[in-house]
């Protein structure tokens, strides 16, 4: 039975998303586009016949594949601000398409699907806004991933293969059709990936191997920054237990003391290796043992962030399918089961309300150094996994 308070979900969700959109428009027009400027510069180089310089001539590090610069270079025919607006408009369209992709998985009354979807977006509002602000591509990666996983068409897997090479963050998802013995989908994803790798050759670049080598060097040069913006579990281990001063961004340029001097470099390295192995085993366990379902795919999409040494805040748009599944169940709880909302409300707070605008510079800096958004993401994974193994979400 649908609780009486459910009638408030739609108006409150619409109002919240409206506020989210207004905030996003203001942020992107006032102080946005930092990462998009790097993309735009690379696209300009391709259009001017200087594709070989995309990794050497950049306002910041360009870390994406050569095909990303080549395939999307037509966007640089437009002036920067128009191109940036078009880029973010495409993101909004992608999120609308995602609404229809996930609609078959609405558990309750279809009339409540719209507020469920809106509140799932609100759950990731902070990483969503950051992705829009900086002009990042994580929203596109999320939508392409869920399109392939939910529709299981060869076309969707072909496109996922293309974008997975552009930003290798989602490459592990290409293992899914192979383990599920869906040969056509697997071949399609490989074809897309190969096209994405080899596309510069199609354009006739003589220095194709050099470009790939420069791309690899650009990725390797990222290093392992322990600054507070890095929300990875591995960075958290070093910040907590190495005893080294760290850079908390909101505190200024000087490093500050944080954490405890408990473990040696070797011990911390071994802890990180153990964590990565544990995550890989967990990923493979779900991949091999669970049946094809939205629960399985939401978990796999969420887990890909866990072993990374670099996890920036907009990456947590990948929390969306987990939030969707959990809210699908919890928004309609009644009576004594309402206590289950508390950890999810706490997770929402960790994800969205720990910025300096809400709790001030000092406290927000400490929360950021504790990888608070990753902790929220881990809670969502734990909740979704335990729920999926005890009952259907």
What do the PLM-derived regions correspond to, one by one?
Residues 89-97, 136-144, 163-170, 190, ...:
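Membrane-embedded alpha-helical segments of multi-pass membrane proteins
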Residues 292-296, 308-320, 329, 335-339:
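Short amphipathic alpha-helix initiation/capping segments at coil-to-helix junctions
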Residues 160-177, 308-318:
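Transmembrane helices and adjacent periplasmic/lumenal helix-loop junctions
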Residues 304, 319, 350:
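Residues in well-ordered beta-strands of folded domains
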Residues 324-393:
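Aromatic-enriched
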Residues 10-11, 171, 340:
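Sec-dependent signal peptide recognition
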Residues 2-156, 180-313:
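Primarily membrane-embedded glycan-assembly and transfer machineries that use lipid-linked glycans
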Residues 97-101, 143-153, 176-181, 321-335, ...:
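Transmembrane alpha-helices and membrane-interface helical segments
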